[in-house]
Structure formats: structure tokens, C-alpha cells
Amino acid sequence: VATRNMAMSRQKKLDKMEVIELAKEKPKPEFCFKEARAAGKVIFETDDLVIGYNKKPLSKPINLRMERGEKIAVTGTNGIGKTTFLKSVLGLIPAVSGKAVLGDYLYKGYFEQEIKPGNNTCIEEIWETFPSYTQYEVRSALAKCGLTTEHIESKVRVLSGGEQAKVRLCKLINVETNILLLDEPTNHLDIDAKDELKRALKEYKGAVLIVCHEPDFYEDLVDKVWNLEEYSLLA
């Protein structure tokens, strides 16, 4: 009876104790961009480039030039044409008029603002891009980008915006590049991931063209700022 009373007394004490949750696995990201050989002197140059969709212009003629190793932020209000400018430079959409001329020996890395994820798990997503990787290498690459085991084994579409961005950054950092074109890469990232991305971009020797609406992120990262409002037909 005494033993039973002691056990009940201990159980009451346990019931009163607050439940302490173990800290959830939260790996810190480590981004390190792989670098290709040096690009030619000129990365790209625009010649009276007018951007827009379906032949409807969004801008006045744009004449800009980017050189090897430069880091430039593209800014402006929403809807001004920042994404359109990036896609026009890359040749992914046609210019309304004028042109963008790309330089020599470019190894491009492009981070799109939004991509609709398919049905792949994170592992499958990376394996499709890097089929020669072992499963261990795929898992390690994803973990380095700050994803947990649970994330890594999940389908990309069920992840949060920040976690999906880390999967896409995982693809980007493991390809050799000498020019990065980044469209709002900080949009969904947590503070640790933002800080680490900024550190990695500062260390990167190639050119960086980044669309960003966060001055705190780009101000001490870039050499110059291109404000597309200066070229806007809406201004």
C-alpha cells in the first residue's frame, strides 16, 4: 500500500510539472556558391531595351551595362517591371523593342521569384538536377541549406515558402556560375537564412543582379542600384 501511495504521489507531482518540449531540429543554413571560370568583361548591355508583355511597353528605352564581378540591385515599386527586366535580359521573354546583348563565357544561375512546385519530394527535386549525386550527397546538400530530415523527405509543395526557397537555393549553389540573377530571393526566408545568403553573396566572386525590396539586405552588398522607376511609363 505504501509503495502504491508513493507511486500515486509521484504521479501527481509529474502531472503538475509543465511539459518541456525538446527543441525541434532546426539546422542553420550554410550557403556557398560554386564558381565557374571568369566571364568576359561585359556581362550584358541593353540597347534601347523596352520591356513589356504582349507588345505592350512597360518602360522607356533602357540603356544599361553590367560588367564582370559587379553586384547590382534592381529596385522599384511593385508592377514596375523588375521581373520582366530580368527575363528580358535573359531572353526568356521578347523585348517590345531594342535588345539585350549577353557577353561571353557566361555561366548563369537564375532564381525565379515564384515557381509552382510539382509532385516531387525534395530528394527527387535535387536528384533530377544532379542525377550523379548519391542519396547521401543529396541529403547533405539539402541539410546544408537548413532543411530538416522531415522537410527533406516531404513533397516540395507541402513545404512553407521559406523551405521551398531553400530547396531552390540548394539547386542554385550546387551549379557552377559566374553570374547570378536573383528575383526577390529573400521574400520568404527567415532571418538566419537571409544573413547567410548575404554573407555567401558577399563572398561570391561572380556578378550578381538582384531584384530586392529590402534596402537592409542589399545596401552593403551591391556596388550600385538600378531604380526602374526612372524608366517607367507609369511614373
Where are these regions (language model features)?
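Alpha-helix N-cap/helix-initiation sites
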Residues: 4-7, 135
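Long, charge-dense, solvent-exposed interaction surfaces that engage phosphate-rich ligands
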Residues: 10-11
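Active-site phosphate-binding and catalytic loops of NTP-dependent enzymes
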Residues: 22-26
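Short intracellular "coupling" helices and adjacent cytoplasmic loop segments at the cytosolic face
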Residues: 1-5, 21
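ABC ATP-binding cassette signature C-motif
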Residues: 27, 33-235
